[in-house]
């Protein structure tokens, strides 16, 4: 992983994102909004441990109470390596479960489902990051299993 310093263009992009989200919040006062920032390998220089603070910058722009904001923090390469796929920018089963518990807490939800086991599918896939390496690398698709899952309704 090669760290790239934060640029002015990225700051402009972040500010535009914040303005768009605030416009949506203002346009729909009948809805409750929540924001959850996911730190990833582009948010921290793993050599020095220095963060770009995009998470704090982004969330501080939003017209939301602090109780409606959350951050999935990555503080070291070890944490990143444990929680994200090697070949992709998405969480693996460990990271997605940690985020699920965290988001549930931010939303004021109930008790989280607890995994009953780990399922190793044996299936391999090459994520978006592997394109940079001519697809020489792959990850195994591994997920938690649960006894039951609740039914959800979405708008």
What does each model-found stretch correspond to?
Residues 1-155:
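Extracellular glycan-modifying ectodomains
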